Amino acid sequence: MERGVFQFVFRYSKAQQLVLILVVIASLPFYFFSLDIPKQIVDKAIRGSDFPTNYYGLDLEQVPFLMVLCAIFLILVVVNGGFKFFLNVYRGAAGERLLRRLRYQLIERVLRFPRPQFRKTSQGEVVSMVTLETEPLGGFFGDALNLPSYQGGLLLTLMGFMFVQDWKLGLAAIALYPVQGWLIPKLQRQVNALGKERVKSVRRLNERIGEAVTGAHEVHANDTSQYELADYSTRLGKIFDIRYQIYKKKFFIKFVNNFLALLPPFFFYSIGGWLVIVGDMTVGSLIAVLGAYKDVSAPWKMLLGYYQRKEDARIKYEQLIEKFELNDLLEEEKLVAEPDDKPAMTGQLVAANTSLSEDDGLKVVDGASMRVDLPSHFAVVGPPGGGKGEFSQMIARLLNPSGGKISLNDTDLSGLPEAFTGRQISYAGQTPYIFGGTIRDNLLYGLKHRPLREIEYEGSAASARERQISEADVTGNVSHDINANWVDVNAAGADSEDDLVGRMQHYLKIVGLEDDVYSIGLRQNIEPSERPELVENLLAARKKMRERLDEGKVSDYVESFDADKFNSNASVAENILFGTPVG
């Protein structure tokens, strides 16, 4: 990943940033003309006396001349508004695309983390960094070059306009800017340092809260709740102190900005008024300068705010890179590669003098070797904590050996992509993870490697899918359709979807979960809009069952539920409720 935030912006949005700068340059002449029109309206159309006047080849009386100037002013307002609308929308889209790319890169890196890294980084910390801490970066990405070029262009245009009207007033307008340019960044660096410390403190608090949630039983079992609360109180107090210092410095910066911004109008009214009195300046020019300076404060404040945001974004980005830039990441090629030549899971599996060390240097596995002819059954035995579980995970390529190597037919397993190890080698640990979704999704999770059969979209759905692919390509995301059929039925030894269902039932029966899953299914509600075919089949089966009961002349022995009849096989309460209370 790029080490700096501007490197990231330049690499992935150079063309978009160039378009924004060109549009900014094109908009500035129109903005300058919009500043000059009010002066012409006051001095020439309202206070003027030489009529009719020639205006670009047209002889106009006073009122028509006034209306023409007002119409031009209105047109310029619309044009300037159009430029601003385009810039806002375009930079917003550019920023969101960069934010999407950054989040995707971070999520991809999480998938490439070595497993020991998850013992150092809590789940909450990773989630917070990928979602919350990247959010402010999205707004800055779009403004990285657009805001300083646009607001800086407006500021220079306004300054140039004021100097054209009178150089003394122009000089008075910018006299205090060097002071602000020196003082504000100096104060802002102090705020940035505090902000960096605040982020670290909040992360440590998140980690401690995660520990309390995971180890809540230990807290209650040992009566250490007051100790834990004291720790949280101390951490919250530290965060409060940091934030309080940030507030004081930020509002002091705001106070200085406001004070220095209100001094130039004093010079305008005093010096400008004197120039009007002695006849060296027109009233229209003074009004135009006052109006221009009123607009100057906005881009100047935006530029000062941009400096603060730039420093915040730089700190956030560098902290993210620091957390996600690891030396022992799984190579990206191994994560996505689809090799043409896939070695068979036969032959010899050899572990040669393998070892596995913890971060503190403690060896969990030391000098383990084996040679097994595949296919075969074998067991790794040893005392609790003796490393047999870690050795099994090294065979499954879930952990990388610190020393030695594990090979299949002289091919180092660590050099093979996950497309091989993830499909040819399975690992079932003591604490499997259940993903959100259905039981079927979890049972078939190991068969979803690549999309096998795409969905044929039509109409608006096809257009939406094309746009989804286009945006994914632009932002460096994978463009696979999550709604496609990902299940590789052949990998499960099945010939079709129906055959796959039978195999699922077979394996559930082997592990003793068939009745449990069946019972769970009976207790579920079916959403008709999501499973219309299943609902239709169930209603047809109910009707068919009723017909068979009647044909077999056993309907007297089976009493079906009917809302209009009393059911003699149910209690009075169940008849009144037409059901059984839950809970």
Can you name each region flagged by the protein language model?
Residues Q7-K14, R115-P116, L132-F141, L145, ...:
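An intracellular "coupling" helix at the cytosolic face of ABC transporter transmembrane type-1 domains
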Residues Q17-S27, N146-E197, S270-M281:
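Transmembrane helices of ABC transporter permease
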Residues S49, E96, Y104-S128, L132-T134, ...:
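Short intracellular "coupling" helices and adjacent cytoplasmic loop segments at the cytosolic face
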Residues F73-N80, Y177-I184, K250-P264, S270, ...:
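Hydrophobic alpha-helical segments in the permease module
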Residues A221-T224, K248, D295-E325:
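Cytosolic ends of transmembrane helices, especially the final helix of ABC transmembrane type-1 domains
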Residues F324-S376:
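Primarily ABC-family ATPase nucleotide-binding module
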Residues I395-A396:
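Helix-to-loop junction immediately C-terminal to a conserved catalytic motif
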